[in-house]
Amino acid sequence: MSKFILKILWLDENVALAVDQVVGKGTSPLTKYFFWPRNDAWEELKKELESKHWISDLDRVELLNKATEVINYWQEEGRNRPMAEAQLKFPEVTFTGSA
């Protein structure tokens, strides 16, 4: 997954997911943010990644699996926990937000 970074916007009522591509020493946005539970963020992210045919199946599956883990954590306990705890639980994911 080192070619891509899963980005999470951690909010009180929603969690949002986006993917950046690593380019050189920086990153470039690859997708917009998809919000959960406002919309089906996982399904929207899946469709967006599938539309980019140059992303390997392995990279796509790794990104979607990590997105599943983050969404499940947020649903089960994370929404009531500070973002710093989520950052510790998922160190390979980039977090930002207000919670």
From Swiss-Prot:
PANTHER family: 30S RIBOSOMAL PROTEIN 3, CHLOROPLASTIC, OS04G0461100 PROTEIN. InterPro entries: PSRP-3/Ycf65_sf, Ribosomal_PSRP3/Ycf65. This is Probable small ribosomal subunit protein cS23. One of its GO terms (biological process) is translation. It comes from the Bacteria. Probably a ribosomal protein or a ribosome-associated protein. The keyword Oxidoreductase does not apply. GO terms for molecular function: structural constituent of ribosome. One of its GO terms (cellular component) is ribonucleoprotein complex. Part of the 30S ribosomal subunit. Pfam families: PSRP-3_Ycf65. Belongs to the chloroplast-specific ribosomal protein cS23 family. Gene3D superfamilies: 3.30.390.140. Keywords: Ribonucleoprotein, Ribosomal protein.
